[in-house]
Amino acid sequence: MSEKNLKQTVEERALALLEPIVAGEGLELVDLEFLREREGWVLRLFIDKPGGRVGLDECTQVSRAVDPSLDVEDFIPHEYNLEVSSPGVDRPLRKPTHFERVKGQQVKVKTFGPVGEPPRKNFTGTLTEVAGDGISVEVEGAGTFHILFKDIAKANLEFQF
């Protein structure tokens, strides 16, 4: 299995396994990533607290809650470190509800393939609309682009200095 396929498989299985566990702790699993870093493999979870901030206590709580299930399921073929953190200022946007929360703010969106006219894959601008099938992003000097959720490869809140 290629590293890319391994990464995707682990992320999909981990998301399906861990999302309900994190929800059971009263928190939200915003995103996760499985990647190889200099020190080895890392499974990194990004959690959020509805209506509040995530602190060290919540990260520890989630780590302790998910660790036994990861050990029992044992689907990760490499030794890895588990990291749990808040999504940070450039929080990932994965679900329609994530986009709803940041409507009117600056976002950065990458698509799987070219979208819009003129066609492009990278969009940085104001999130102006969240509809049933996608979002609209107003890019300064280029207009407003409608992007379907299925076409979004990656999206983040863009921190404003």
Curated annotation (Swiss-Prot):
<dbReference type="InterPro" id="IPR003728">
    <property type="entry name" value="Ribosome_maturation_RimP"/>
</dbReference>
<protein>
    <recommendedName>
        <fullName>Ribosome maturation factor RimP</fullName>
    </recommendedName>
</protein>
<dbReference type="InterPro" id="IPR036847">
    <property type="entry name" value="RimP_C_sf"/>
</dbReference>
<comment type="similarity">
    <text>Belongs to the RimP family.</text>
</comment>
<dbReference type="InterPro" id="IPR028998">
    <property type="entry name" value="RimP_C"/>
</dbReference>
<keyword id="KW-0690">Ribosome biogenesis</keyword>
<comment type="function">
    <text>Required for maturation of 30S ribosomal subunits.</text>
</comment>
<dbReference type="GO" id="GO:0006412">
    <property type="term" value="P:translation"/>
</dbReference>
<keyword id="KW-0963">Cytoplasm</keyword>
<dbReference type="InterPro" id="IPR035956">
    <property type="entry name" value="RimP_N_sf"/>
</dbReference>
<dbReference type="InterPro" id="IPR028989">
    <property type="entry name" value="RimP_N"/>
</dbReference>
<dbReference type="Pfam" id="PF02576">
    <property type="entry name" value="RimP_N"/>
</dbReference>
<dbReference type="Pfam" id="PF17384">
    <property type="entry name" value="DUF150_C"/>
</dbReference>
<dbReference type="GO" id="GO:0000028">
    <property type="term" value="P:ribosomal small subunit assembly"/>
</dbReference>
<dbReference type="GO" id="GO:0005829">
    <property type="term" value="C:cytosol"/>
</dbReference>
